[in-house]
Regions:
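A positional/architectural concept
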Residues: 3-16, 20-40
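Positively charged
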Residues: 12, 54-58, 71, 75
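Short, structured motif recognition centered on aromatic/hydrophobic residues
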Residues: 14-18, 90-94, 117-119
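Short, charged/polar surface micro-motifs in flexible loops or helix N-caps
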Residues: 41-44, 51-55
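Short, solvent-exposed interaction modules
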Residues: 61-92, 98-99
């Protein structure tokens, strides 16, 4: 399981160093094979171990092509998907198109989300968190959740 928030500097080539605490799990789960795509609702990237991505991709591909929402999701998630290999130094090269989509500069934030990571520009992540704190706490539907 991937959890936690890690600020990371991209190098001049646009490579992201996977935090050390995740490297063994990534090796065990997917032999360093990852898939990067864009989030269809936010200006962030989604990074999946290959087996988890295969499950997501199959679900998205099973949606009806006649649905406008399904086509949009297919275009965003599958159309922007890139296969990436973690190199021997634990780095991933983030393609330029993905960096542009997510407004990456030098500083990014890697956010563990269970079976995947979200990767945000640090400034967009900070703005998102400020917006969360400013929102009213509408927890309808989550009454039984124990935190």
């Amino acid at each position: 399981m991937f959890r936690g928030i890690t600020p990371i500097n991209l190098d001049v080539k646009g490579r992201l160093a996977i935090p050390t605490r995740y490297r063994d799990e990534i090796q065990d789960r997917c032999d360093q094979k990852m898939v990067l795509t864009v989030d269809h609702r936010e200006r962030c990237l989604l990074l999946y171990p290959l087996p988890d991505w295969n499950t997501v991709e199959a679900s998205v591909n099973a949606l009806p092509n006649t649905s406008k929402a399904a086509r949009r999701l297919q275009h965003m998630l599958i159309g922007h998907a890139s296969d990436l290999d973690v190199d021997g130094s634990g780095r991933l090269l983030i393609p330029a198109l993905h960096r542009e989509h997510a407004h990456f500069e030098k500083r990014v934030v890697m956010v563990g989300q269970g079976h995947r990571f979200e990767i945000w520009s640090e400034s967009l992540w900070q703005a998102k968190n400020e917006a969360y704190l400013a929102e009213d706490d509408d927890m309808s539907g989550l009454e039984d959740l124990r935190l």
